[in-house]
Amino acid sequence: MFRLSHYLDQLYHPTPPRIARGTPKPVVIWNLTRRCNLKCKHCYTVSADVDFPGELTAAQARETLEDIGRFKVPALILSGGEPLLRDDLFALAKRARALTRVLALSTNGTGVIGSKADRVAEIGFDYVGISIDGIGATNDAFRGVIGAYEQALAGVRSCKRRGIKVGLRFTITEQNESQLPELLKLCDDEGVDKFYLSHLVYAGRGNKNRGEDADHARTRRAMDLLIARALESAEGRGHPLEIVTGNNDADAVYFLNWAKANFPAAQVAHLRKHLEAWGGNASGVGVANIDTQGDVHPDTYWSEYTVGSVKQTPFSELWTGPDPMLAELRRRPRPLKGRCGACAHQAVCGGNTRIRALQLTGDPWAEDPACYLTAAETGTATDIDRLTVRPFIGDRHDPKPAFV
């Protein structure tokens, strides 16, 4: 996750960068259930409104939660599917509140009303993220259910009335990019605390719909708008909205280039130190995933690669064990190839999102086709052939993944 507002603030109010020693404890994103009342086009878990066999039992989930607490992860995000559809969500969340420093809920928002909204407030979640992918019918088409927009908006308002910090999550595609200005206005009108723009990741239904990914021009236009909006908040103009992006760490380099054009060299050098201390893509390093079956992955999109299962081995042991793919992800620099391997900004970006490269080439270290930076911006040769996105036409037409 690229915290645009945070790093913009470093240009105005600089603080020393914090250099991590060794591998940090990860933020854990835990998919508690695959069941969901929506059918989103980008869903990486391919969720549906049915029961899925093999999900963690209440006892297994409690045991895993205690291990996470002892491991002292910096943050725990409870997700799904739709986590509010898991019967023991609030029991788990109440215990998690006592065990973790930061506790967040990732929801489609349609169920955060009435008594359930009261329970969310009582638990004391630090943050509730609600997904909205367009205004009105655009969101409903994206999420597969008519009325989903109004229900999610009701969830946002329920959170705000109860004093819960709430954010909107928006996945950008070619179909909804034009509505980004309206969504930012919605944040201002509703007093939303955070806006999270997610770039499309080619996992689950997101892979099947990868042909609808936003092209590079749309992505650059969206980033220009987000930077301008973050600047308003940094300068004390309008509603104070925190801006973050995810799943395309080229955003950090794009922002760095914007800073070069608008701030003195000394401030830009300070910003780069902070961005290098952050390091870009955090899969297998600062982010971990436990899926609904209890399988552990480098992040939520790495379902093709499993480190192990918490049904057999505690998460803490799996994460600190000798897994070869985790070891490769933690290398700096990473063993990147193609355009990413030749890029001058690997220390900032970390190689971007490896899953897009994996889906198109079978190689987790190939270049990321969603990098929208030009050859001049990356310092790469102009004659390097770009990896382009082929629309999905079936699994048998994609290369099989090859890991270490």
Swiss-Prot record:
The keyword S-adenosyl-L-methionine applies. Pathway: Porphyrin-containing compound metabolism. [4Fe-4S] cluster 1 binds at C36, C40, C43. It comes from Dinoroseobacter shibae (strain DSM 16493 / NCIMB 14021 / DFL 12). Involved in heme d1 biosynthesis. Radical SAM enzyme that catalyzes the removal of two propionate side chains from the intermediate 12,18-didecarboxysiroheme (DDSH) and may introduce the keto functions on rings A and B, yielding the heme d1 precursor dihydro-heme d1. GO terms for biological process: heme biosynthetic process. It comes from the Bacteria. Its cofactor is [4Fe-4S] cluster. Changing C40A: Contains half the amount of iron and sulfide per enzyme compared to the wild-type. NCBIfam families: rSAM_NirJ (TIGR04051). Belongs to the radical SAM superfamily. GO terms for molecular function: 4 iron, 4 sulfur cluster binding; catalytic activity; metal ion binding. This is Pre-heme d1 synthase. Binds 2 [4Fe-4S] clusters per subunit. The keyword S-adenosyl-L-methionine applies. Keywords: 4Fe-4S, Iron, Iron-sulfur, Metal-binding, S-adenosyl-L-methionine. Residues 22-235 form the Radical SAM core domain. It holds the Pfam family Radical_SAM. [4Fe-4S] cluster 2 binds at C340, C343, C349, C371.
